[in-house]
Amino acid sequence: GMKDYFKKLLQKVIKKIKSFRKKQD
């Protein structure tokens, strides 16, 4: 359902932010 879709989308965004922060350091 929609909740599953948003959970997956949120996880993708979190992974991108984490990898982006690693590149910054």
UniProtKB/Swiss-Prot annotation:
Role, per record: May have cytolytic and antimicrobial activity.
GO CC aspect terms: extracellular region
Name of the featured protein: Oxyopinin-3c
Tissue occurrence: Expressed by the venom gland.
Coiled-coil segments: none
Molecular function in Gene Ontology: toxin activity
Localization: Secreted
GO biological process terms held by the UniProt record: killing of cells of another organism
Top-level taxon of origin: Eukaryota
UniProt entry keywords in alphabetical sequence: Antimicrobial, Cytolysis, Secreted, Toxin
